[in-house]
């Protein structure tokens, strides 16, 4: 087994990899090469996560679309099953019949 050197990614004592240090490019002076490297790293990270994000967006969109269609379908179903107006007509006929009965009874 080789002895770890200063350029190794894992610290020999703790066994942990060093973390990348966060920098603010607006405060710290960076060379154009460093800025270009940052852009390349960001682009690579974006391209790496793009398929997963696209898949999640598609699944979310399909889920929302299915929910909308389910609500829409249920609304049509419940309206077609509704007998509300029929009940009102029956009550109105009964009220007219009672009114005629009272009028003829007096």
From Swiss-Prot:
Give the matching Pfam families. Answer: Coa3_cc
The record places the following residue ranges in the Mitochondrial intermembrane compartment, namely: 79-106
Please state where this protein is localized. Mitochondrion inner membrane
Q: Where are the transmembrane segments?
A: 58-78
Family matches, as InterPro entries: Coa3, Coa3_cc
The residue ranges for the Mitochondrial matrix side of the membrane come to 2-57
What's this protein's family per the entry?
Belongs to the COA3 family.
Q: Please identify the protein, giving its name as recorded.
A: Cytochrome c oxidase assembly factor 3 homolog, mitochondrial
**Which organism was this protein described from?**
Bos taurus (Bovine)
């Amino acid at each position: 087994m080789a002895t770890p050197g200063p350029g190794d990614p894992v610290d020999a004592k703790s066994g942990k990899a060093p973390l990348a240090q966060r920098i603010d490019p607006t405060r710290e002076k960076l060379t154009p090469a460093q800025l270009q490297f940052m852009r390349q790293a960001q682009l690579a990270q974006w391209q790496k996560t793009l398929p997963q994000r696209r898949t999640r967006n598609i699944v979310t969109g399909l889920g929302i679309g299915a929910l909308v269609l389910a609500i829409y379908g249920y609304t049509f179903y419940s309206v077609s099953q509704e007998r509300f107006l029929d009940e009102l007509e029956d009550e109105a006929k009964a009220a007219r019949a009672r009114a005629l009965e009272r009028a003829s009874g007096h």
